[in-house]
């Protein structure tokens, strides 16, 4: 039986994260992982193997919306997609980690989160930081892309972090 994985990335743009997304997704697909990409940017499908299924909004209306709108749209799709499945897939969140984790945990689904930005820039607010700490500790696995981020996450959020360098 093939393993199932939903890659949650509401907004696919041009950058290093996306390059990693293409490489990792295509690698997993070649290695017999049933992979689905949940995004508002179906226009980026040409960068992926033909075996990879795109779920989410198909309408081009969403492609040029801001990240917050894309996050909301894809979180709604994630919620209903997980509800209708008998066998729950693993969710791998590239973006909107906190929100995707809440949905996954409410629906008894395993989730891996990936963070590639240092918490110092976005976690200055104490309440926001405490909420994030609570949510990130619900994830089954937390990944970062450098030993520096690993140390920062472990210290600030008291969470076990795996460091996987960019391919």
Ranges and model annotations:
Residues 41, 93-97, 146-147:
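Helix N-cap/beta->alpha junction signal
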Residues 74, 92-99, 115-116:
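Short His-centered aromatic/hydrophobic patch
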Residues 90, 104-121:
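Active-site proximal beta-strand in glycosyltransferases
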Residues 90, 138-147, 162:
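A short beta-strand/loop micro-motif in the catalytic core of glycosyltransferases
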Residues 148, 167:
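Carbohydrate-associated surface elements
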